[in-house]
Amino acid sequence: MKHAVSALTLILLLIPGTSAAQAPAEESGGDAPPPAPPSSQLRWSLGLGVISSPRPYVGVDNKITPVPLLELYYKKYYVHGNQAGYHFIDTEKYTFDARIGFIFAGLDPDDSPQLDGMIKRNSSIEAGFVFDWKPGKYRLSTSIYTDILGNSKGQQAATDFSRMWIFNRYRWGLSPSVGIVWQSSNMVDYYVGVTPEEVRPGRPAFRGHSALNFRAGLFGFFNLNMRIRLTGLIRAQRLDNEISDSPIVDESRGFFGLVGVTYRFGALPPRPGS
């Protein structure tokens, strides 16, 4: 399974297994990418990207951050972005993986005077399972994760549908996607809840409940040559009222963007048509 790197900085816009922003995979089909090298060969790429991350907390501006972009595949193991995984099943039509990754989330009261008196919420690590169904150029991906450090004691799950268009014999491609993200009441309450101790004038107590967020995105790539690739991703998400009604949240919609360049090391796949 070949994924573009994912990177998100807020759990409210994080794609489970995303993470963030996990770009659609390169699908098989009439304009399919060239065959991958044998699975026993190490395949990896490294690059640099820039992300623009919406931060919905009151008084906190969007953040633009440079990030390293890493992909590594060896046999059934892989690392991409902020996640690592193992393929239990990996066929042309189905994949079933165990996956672990960082949750780049959290609240820092120093980020805004309007958050004064809030207790810091920490990033965490999540683990879970991902099932992908890949009929032709389409992909239906379902994932479920739990916070294994117990910071939020919460879970999140997602279902995404995407379609890949490949052009000019794999020179460039586009993939739109739509999806939904469910987050448990514990997770929502941890990141946007307000405890009685955090109440201030204009900031009443708030207890978060489970939320269902909607998102849509567009991923694209352009291969400069067999080793250098440009990638881009833009994703919009609408937050559930269970999140946007929190007194420490002032945005119900957000946009995430990523642009980057990567260099592929090691063995190369055969050129298309060779």
Predicted regions located by residue number:
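Outer-membrane beta-barrel "beta-signal"
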Residues: 67-71, 161, 252-274
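Residues that define the transmembrane beta-barrel architecture of outer-membrane proteins
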Residues: 42, 62-68, 92-94, 121-127, ...
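Short glycine/proline- and aromatic-enriched beta-strand/turn motifs that initiate or cap beta-hairpins
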Residues: 22-78, 266
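Cleavable N-terminal export/targeting peptides
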Residues: 1-40, 266-274
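Membrane-embedded beta-strands of outer-membrane beta-barrel proteins
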Residues: 46, 68, 129, 159-161, ...
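Repeated loop/turn-to-beta-strand initiation elements of outer-membrane beta-barrel proteins
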Residues: 44, 76-79, 94, 137-140, ...
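Transmembrane beta-barrel strands of outer-membrane/channel proteins
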Residues: 46-52, 83, 98-102, 129, ...
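Outer-membrane beta-barrel transmembrane domain signature
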Residues: 87-88, 148-251, 265-267
